[in-house]
């Protein structure tokens, strides 16, 4: 799915049979993980994967996929405030592509500007997992 479609995800863009999602707030050293249910319309932070190694990060994501059995993955894609791409935009997209190659489920990309900032401003104990939760909640709102 393209970013433009994901940013304003609609029921038409995301098939209604997809009900559960694992959200990922990608970072080069930490990746936040959260789970959401379309039926409940809510998300919950799970944990943060702490590694800078791509294979180790993907292995930890696999553990979460096996445990939570999501029907799709949602990856936050960072942008500058003006919408311009930067180095981490490309890294997050590469991460999303690697997820598509490893897991037999849809992977959606969502504009995640300010999610970590919002999580920190809310006093989250685990800002990365909370940012993943915010990304999923934004995604779910787009489906309504």
Residue ranges and their predicted role:
Residues 1-24, 28-144:
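Phosphate- and other anionic-substrate recognition elements at nucleic-acid/protein interfaces
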């Amino acid at each position: 799915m393209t970013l433009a479609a994901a940013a304003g995800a609609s029921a038409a863009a995301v098939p209604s049979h997809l009900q559960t999602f694992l959200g990922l707030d990608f970072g080069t050293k930490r990746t936040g993980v959260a789970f959401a249910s379309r039926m409940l319309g809510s998300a919950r932070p799970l944990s943060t994967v702490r590694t800078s190694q791509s294979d180790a990060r993907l292995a930890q994501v696999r553990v979460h996929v096996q445990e939570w059995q999501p029907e799709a993955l949602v990856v936050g894609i960072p942008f500058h405030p003006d919408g311009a791409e930067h180095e981490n935009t490309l890294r997050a997209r590469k991460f999303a592509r690697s997820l598509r190659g490893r897991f037999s489920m849809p992977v959606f990309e969502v504009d995640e500007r300010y999610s970590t900032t919002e999580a920190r401003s809310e006093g989250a104990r685990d800002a990365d997992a909370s940012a993943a939760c915010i990304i999923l909640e934004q995604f779910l709102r787009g489906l309504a």
